[in-house]
């Protein structure tokens, strides 16, 4: 129960920091950057019902996506240890990688190179690449330190268990059994670190995506975004759900993590609707704030997708035993990246 509370506190802290970061974005827009009021797609009255549809549709698809892996152990052909689940997980990892490279990173480049920003310093230094690079390195540090702390805690707990009489029975087990237990324990710790860090990264960019959709009154843009984001959230949820499943959390913690993933984007949309009259997505402050958040999120998602998800699976024993399965998983990952690349046309 304590770990669940800690996890909830982490998520609330991230959401609070994002709120403070976005609040200065309520500012004036330079005349040359103002939206063309004669555009037939700009209609606040028609946009509101579409945004409400978006909240419901994205909430439902997010719940389906993140919940599907959690119930897969009850479906024989989708068992977490099976080949089909591995292929689906690689596809979902490809979705996350495609999100970082084809959606979040380009958005950051576009925002931080906007003509609405001053030449000095925004047009004289590649801030997006720099911040994304730092984000990847910081994620590596967090990943490493968190794993180290989890491992030390597990070793301490194991030492306490050794002081009990139960160790007499355990010592009679074959060495290979104890080694296997130790290996499984270390792998479980890695899964838990991955699930936590990935969820925090997804929450950051989900709030930004939702805010952008909620703040815009462009009905043409909203219509395309609804379908694209439903697809995106469903399969990104499958990737996260697979990590949560492998982490073997308690049912309460699984529910908490799934709940926060499902409601983050709809909450961002609701926040965008509330701020739509004062929030200007092309104001300098908004461009800088959201652009830097996107760069941070992109670095984190790219690192997690490549290092903690795809590389970990491809170098794992299951895929290393079968070249055919490796090719199938590579094709699935490529398909996931390709799907997000196609969606980049609309979202």
Swiss-Prot record:
<feature type="transmembrane region" description="Helical">
    <location>
        <begin position="52"/>
        <end position="72"/>
    </location>
</feature>
<feature type="topological domain" description="Extracellular">
    <location>
        <begin position="276"/>
        <end position="286"/>
    </location>
</feature>
<dbReference type="GO" id="GO:0005886">
    <property type="term" value="C:plasma membrane"/>
</dbReference>
<feature type="transmembrane region" description="Helical">
    <location>
        <begin position="193"/>
        <end position="213"/>
    </location>
</feature>
<keyword id="KW-1133">Transmembrane helix</keyword>
<feature type="topological domain" description="Extracellular">
    <location>
        <begin position="214"/>
        <end position="224"/>
    </location>
</feature>
<dbReference type="InterPro" id="IPR004698">
    <property type="entry name" value="Zn/Fe_permease_fun/pln"/>
</dbReference>
<feature type="transmembrane region" description="Helical">
    <location>
        <begin position="255"/>
        <end position="275"/>
    </location>
</feature>
<feature type="transmembrane region" description="Helical">
    <location>
        <begin position="327"/>
        <end position="347"/>
    </location>
</feature>
<feature type="transmembrane region" description="Helical">
    <location>
        <begin position="84"/>
        <end position="104"/>
    </location>
</feature>
<feature type="topological domain" description="Cytoplasmic">
    <location>
        <begin position="146"/>
        <end position="192"/>
    </location>
</feature>
<keyword id="KW-0472">Membrane</keyword>
<feature type="topological domain" description="Extracellular">
    <location>
        <begin position="28"/>
        <end position="51"/>
    </location>
</feature>
<comment type="function">
    <text>Probably mediates zinc uptake from the rhizosphere.</text>
</comment>
<feature type="transmembrane region" description="Helical">
    <location>
        <begin position="225"/>
        <end position="245"/>
    </location>
</feature>
<protein>
    <recommendedName>
        <fullName>Probable zinc transporter 8</fullName>
    </recommendedName>
</protein>
<feature type="transmembrane region" description="Helical">
    <location>
        <begin position="125"/>
        <end position="145"/>
    </location>
</feature>
<feature type="topological domain" description="Cytoplasmic">
    <location>
        <begin position="246"/>
        <end position="254"/>
    </location>
</feature>
<feature type="topological domain" description="Cytoplasmic">
    <location>
        <begin position="73"/>
        <end position="83"/>
    </location>
</feature>
<dbReference type="GO" id="GO:0071577">
    <property type="term" value="P:zinc ion transmembrane transport"/>
</dbReference>
<dbReference type="GO" id="GO:0005385">
    <property type="term" value="F:zinc ion transmembrane transporter activity"/>
</dbReference>
<keyword id="KW-0812">Transmembrane</keyword>
<comment type="similarity">
    <text>Belongs to the ZIP transporter (TC 2.A.5) family.</text>
</comment>
<feature type="transmembrane region" description="Helical">
    <location>
        <begin position="287"/>
        <end position="307"/>
    </location>
</feature>
<feature type="signal peptide">
    <location>
        <begin position="1"/>
        <end position="27"/>
    </location>
</feature>
<keyword id="KW-1003">Cell membrane</keyword>
<keyword id="KW-0862">Zinc</keyword>
<feature type="topological domain" description="Extracellular">
    <location>
        <begin position="105"/>
        <end position="124"/>
    </location>
</feature>
<dbReference type="Pfam" id="PF02535">
    <property type="entry name" value="Zip"/>
</dbReference>
<keyword id="KW-0864">Zinc transport</keyword>
<feature type="topological domain" description="Cytoplasmic">
    <location>
        <begin position="308"/>
        <end position="326"/>
    </location>
</feature>
<dbReference type="InterPro" id="IPR003689">
    <property type="entry name" value="ZIP"/>
</dbReference>
<keyword id="KW-0406">Ion transport</keyword>
<keyword id="KW-0732">Signal</keyword>
<keyword id="KW-0813">Transport</keyword>
